């Protein structure tokens, strides 16, 4: 049964209820020198600055926000509040914009004012910040970043927003569920209409789960680590035979992931001490399982092994290795089987990061900067090949909420063309009897099923394997084509990772 997502109602650090005070965080104390000149508090200002950078410079919130918090010395509850404001506002933007439009008599808003209003709407509709504090601090923020002129407008609009809760507003501003169910879900769950349609298509016969899938995309994801095999237990390459048995000792601030024997879910959410020492990388559990699936498939021995060449199951390839999470897991497992992984990425800087990550983990790197479509090695060189291809990232909207507003349906065909080329090159790199794993962080059928079936049919020298059977311990992997495995956040608590396994004949 699908896990129904519950709405997040975080206690906001710096809000009157969170702080136990009627004074909003960051506002001056009575009698202080600046008491007559209210300024935006640091947490709200940090969230605003990230929103503007996302809009103006195409910045990534997950990269910019931690650096900004460190630069401004925000820690503890202030950092947590800034994080909630940033990600919550980005996730809910579509819904908030529809509500703000209903509360404003202006056809267009200046972008800075609009972001102030979005932050205010999120506080009013999705956090425990009190109404007075949410409105007053938004007015202070508007004065700080836009000057005094729009403050009255911000005050009036947010007071209108505060007259109803989120569910009541949704019923007013969303299209009728009966007349336009796609439009209703798009507004209710803050996803562009085309993404709602893409998810419905990907769910296929399970389309009744669509609302659960969209709601899960708005939940805050856990921080999950993939620990390099051999770093924690000294047993490189030995995946436990019993999937119920975890391969690693579990530290007190973590819990094992449900299915990956190398996954740890952090309670505290700070992975720095593990990542810096080379013990682990941040990696979603579904991504770990996709890499593990490649290592589980039995190989057909080569018909005519070349004299002097490494024998059966000795050469593995990660074709699109950056930023290196799957490469670390594969390299650790390969070392335990007397095999060696070659990691390749088209961008030299990403290839360099993969090399550094492998070295930190104590692994001998074999890293190549090369376009995966035009590889420098001979055809048939590798026994196992991972093609974790560039994609629309529609499967990781929990982690990159701004991506839903940047991607367009017009970009998908060009991505699919590159994906077909990369899968073709991956198959060409595998020897006869070797195995290829095709992986995307998107459930869009044009990037998943359609790519694999088109390449397989055109080539005629590959067999599509039963991927869900290889990951038999994981329930609910069925996709529109039963040979493929599709993870979903509402079913598995993971990103929406797609996996196909192919054997070259």
Stretch-by-stretch model annotation:
Residues 1-505:
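S-adenosylmethionine
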